[in-house]
Amino acid sequence: MKIGIIGAMELEIDSLRTSIESCKETKIGRFVFYEGTLNGIEVVLLLSGIGKVSASVATTLLIERYNPSLIINTGTAGGLGDTSVHDIILANEVRHHDVDVTAFGYEIGQQAQMPPAFIANTQWTEKLKQVAERYSHTLHYGQVVSGDSFISSPTRLQEIANTFPKAKAVEMEAAAIAQTCYLLNIPFVMLRAISDKAGEGNAVSYETFVVEAGKLSATIIKAFLASISET
């Protein structure tokens, strides 16, 4: 099988990239793909860039060019609710927090003609959960919401929390990746490490913890690939 792995920033994928054997680099437009073997599994690692449009275009290219059996979205996220920095978030579903077509009878966050939420593949998510549980960091399993904003405003944070009370984390790509996978019939999973608390500490806190959070999520993804290779 071949697995696609998507991260938005170099610091989120760097430890994965340097672990790929026989790595072949391909550039398509502004996107960079790294193809090879990681812990016995064929992978295509993709640097998507930040934000929903870039993530969607990148995911489409990944699927069309490489036809992966599974797509993993990894990296970092802003924590919501009872999460803390360096906790792990594993999504059971992802939604857009910056979409509103409720005037036409849709739920808040639901794109027109799309489901209210994009559900992570249950089988692969359970396998990833079993791997993540081996680590000492707190694991949260639940809803993740996406939008094209870095949430540093407490007011905006409260709006998101009120609208999506089940959300465990907020970030800027997962819903777009998941929607693209839904449209093209490719299973997806999402695992990220919390780099900051949304609405608290803003960019300074983020820059302090993002590197280690990115390494943590990458470590779990590598262990997940190894577990697949062993079966």
Locate each region found by the language model.
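Mid-sequence, gly/pro-rich, charge-dense loop/helix-turn segments that line enzyme active sites
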Residues: 80-164
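His/Asp/Glu-rich mid-to-C-terminal helical/loop segments that flank catalytic regions of hydrolases
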Residues: 199-231
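Alpha-helix C-terminal capping segments
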Residues: 61-65, 81-84, 178-187
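Proline-aspartate-enriched helix->loop->beta-strand connector
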Residues: 67-72
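A C-terminal functional module that forms or caps the active site or interfaces directly
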Residues: 151-199
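Short, acidic/turn-prone active-site loops that include or flank metal/cofactor-
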Residues: 29, 50, 93-96, 194-196
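N-terminal short beta-loop-beta anion/metal-coordinating cradle
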Residues: 1-65
